[in-house]
Amino acid sequence: MQNPFTLTFGKSPLEPIERPLQTMEIVDTFTAETVNQQMFIITGVQGSGKTVMMTEIARRLREREDWVVIELNPATDLLQGMLAKLNSNKVCAAIIKSAKIDLSFFGFGVAIEGVPPLTDTETAIITILEKLKKQDKRLLITIDEVTNNDYMKVFAGSFQIFVRQDLPVFLLATGLYENIDELQNEKNLTFLFRAPKIQLKPLNQQAVMNKYKNIFQIDQDVAKQMAELTRGYPFAFQVLGYLTWNHSGHYEAVIDEYEQYLSEFVYDKIWSELSQKDRIVARGIAETESGKIKEIREHLGMETNEFNPYRKRLMKKGIVSGETRGYVFFTLPLFERYVIDNS
């Protein structure tokens, strides 16, 4: 039997653990008869399941007859890419043809006699979206791992225009906290502040335990030990499952390899992107077993007003949880050991 787990980022595994509440929140909002929100941004650390969740939502909407779904590459000209995707989509291509929309200027189709060609990308997209609206169809655009580049700035400005013109276009994007924060602080793009952000938190521990128990046919105590080793971090769930599968279900035999995978695939990158002060605070958290903020500050010799900005930033990055008042803990499994070994 094939290994049901995967080590590939963004690939939907054979044995996923879904996030039903957050998934349904987005699907229900986008499909509501009266539209009051046309954009969601999914954030979280690398390996938290952002792409998998976005893919699942896109799949659900693609199955509906009144939806067109396209995916855009954030590293390329997004408006040009959007027009090309609309032109190559069967539903939109039929609309373009029947409405006699001349896109020959962009290299799509042939010139239509008696019809002036459209020469502005944004105008061409608006024309197609207006026809989609008349046919009671909606368009979902997905963009994975948005970054603050010129293509994204132009696209975000155009998307704002589409929404203002009451066009049936919806955006679902994923991104790391720092990239989203950088983008929404751009002049003229502050509307992104108002877009709902869904920060992916750890998976339900019971769900992780049940998954391991059923796949490996192990007793509850062993499944619980495995689940605790992952802390609900989706990539860790996949890595531990993958390695355990390859070792005939013996998870104790793979713990060193498991830790190495987490370090090389994720933690090295996370650590490299932290500032020196972030790292000092992270070390303080790692060295304070109780997790009490007061004890961490005393250990570091930092006042509250000096400590809090770094605590909040680590929380927004998804590295630290502050759900229990007065305490902070790492959300990532074995990250304490990594921090101490690397600082």
Positions of PLM-derived features:
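Conserved catalytic segments around the Walker B and adjacent sensor/switch elements
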Residues: F40, T55, R59-D77
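A short, basic N-terminal segment
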Residues: M1-F40, L334-F335, D341
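Short regulatory helix/loop adjacent to the ATP-binding pocket of P-loop NTPases
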Residues: E178-A195
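C-terminal leucine-rich, beta-strand-based interaction scaffolds used for sensing/assembly
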Residues: Q2-P4, S263-S343
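Walker A/P-loop nucleotide-binding motif
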Residues: V35-E56
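Conserved small helical "lid"/interfacial subdomain of P-loop NTPases
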Residues: A195-V222
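Conserved Walker B catalytic segment
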Residues: G114-E178, E186
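Amphipathic alpha-helical "lid/sensor" segments that cap RecA-like P-loop NTPase cores
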Residues: F216-Y267
